[in-house]
Amino acid sequence: MEERININVSATNYDQSSGGIRTILTAVVEMVHEENEFRITDSEFAFGWHFYVVSINRLLIQKLADQMGEDFQKLKGKSLEKKFLKWFSQKIQEKNLKAKLAIKEEMESGKYGIF
């Protein structure tokens, strides 16, 4: 079974942010010659924010890291997931998307409170 990394997204505009995220990830898929390696869920709206999850095949992220080489390794973060999250956040900022990202498994751990 494929291993996936789930990223929680919080955004004020679902259509704009999910469209931008889809564009970024489609470019990655094409760059590393993979297919259908990510999924974006529908959003839940609360307190003026849209909350949704982007699920990405870990193999896609590994291939991106391999292709970027040293540039990827220089990104801040200890793990592959953290480095990818940093890279992904930078791409979202470049597109002026108003969205915040967090690795889902970390959000559900005790690090951020009791869930």
Model-derived regions: residue spans:
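A structural detector for beta-sheet-dominated domains
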Residues: 8-12, 41, 55-57, 102-104
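Conserved short beta-strand edge segments in small beta-sheet-based binding/regulatory domains
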Residues: 72-112
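Short glycine-/aliphatic-rich beta-strand segments at the starts of folded cytosolic domains
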Residues: 1-17
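Short amphipathic alpha-helix segments
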Residues: 14-38
